[in-house]
Amino acid sequence: MAIISSHILDSVHGCSASGIRVQCQKILNRNGDHLVFEIEANEEGRIMEEVSFEDSGELFYQLIFFSDEYFRKKMAERYSGRQIVREIVIRLVLPDPETVSYTHLTLP
């Protein structure tokens, strides 16, 4: 078992991105992607999910942050629909969970 967690911030409004929808998908070769979990960030803009790994070795995942949907809800009356970024996708290679206890990824 491993835990995938994130603290998501809304830099437009200077607050936590509470309510943003996030998906975690396991990237499979030619068989498409497998949904691992889908969650909404809590009031502090945090997500935390336990994930079980059936395979060993490096595993390929992606986290998808639905930013357009988030801003559409947050700014309903002022939203122009002109977002050029609909989703933010972060692709990860997760090492064997038995060998790493904590990995921190900071994005600018």
Language-model segments: residues:
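Beta-strand-dominated extracellular/periplasmic modules and repeats
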Residues: 2-97
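Acidic, proline/serine/threonine- and glycine-rich low-complexity intrinsically disordered segments
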Residues: 99-101
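Conserved small/polar residues in nucleotide/adenosyl-binding loops
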Residues: 103-108
